[in-house]
């Protein structure tokens, strides 16, 4: 994790029993100035593993919905830019480069990231998103 005095980029993750995935997820996000995890009451080692990866971990077991957990992430984030990442997702080196370039050039306040669907290491070419909410 970048140890800048004032974080520019926070990567924020919501978790619940993600011990099998959280290290890989956070390892891909290690370039960020700040890693924040809001845990929803994991009963496995998710919190311990996230802390070992350098994340600031906050536990909220009173599940009030996905939106509330996101708001809690925002409340703990100090970065100028916040990137929401799901625990089963990874930031590729190419995406990392795009994120760093976008922040360095800072021509907008919001970016939408398009991603590839991958299963068992292979792209899912017959699957596409038809609609949804920007998040």
Model-based region annotation:
Residues 20-23, 44-53, 94-95:
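Acidic helix N-cap motif at the loop->helix transition within catalytic regions
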Residues 124-135:
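Conserved catalytic loops of nucleotide-sugar-dependent glycosyltransferases that act on lipid-linked
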Residues 80, 90-125:
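Conserved donor NDP-sugar-binding/catalytic core segment of glycosyltransferases
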Residues 61-68, 74:
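A short, glycine-/small-residue-rich helix N-cap motif at loop->alpha-helix starts
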Residues 52, 71-81:
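Active-site nucleotide-sugar/metal-binding loop of Leloir-type enzymes
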Residues 28, 39-51, 62, 86:
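A conserved acidic beta->alpha catalytic loop
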Residues 1-28:
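N-proximal low-complexity "stem/linker" segments adjacent to membrane-targeting elements
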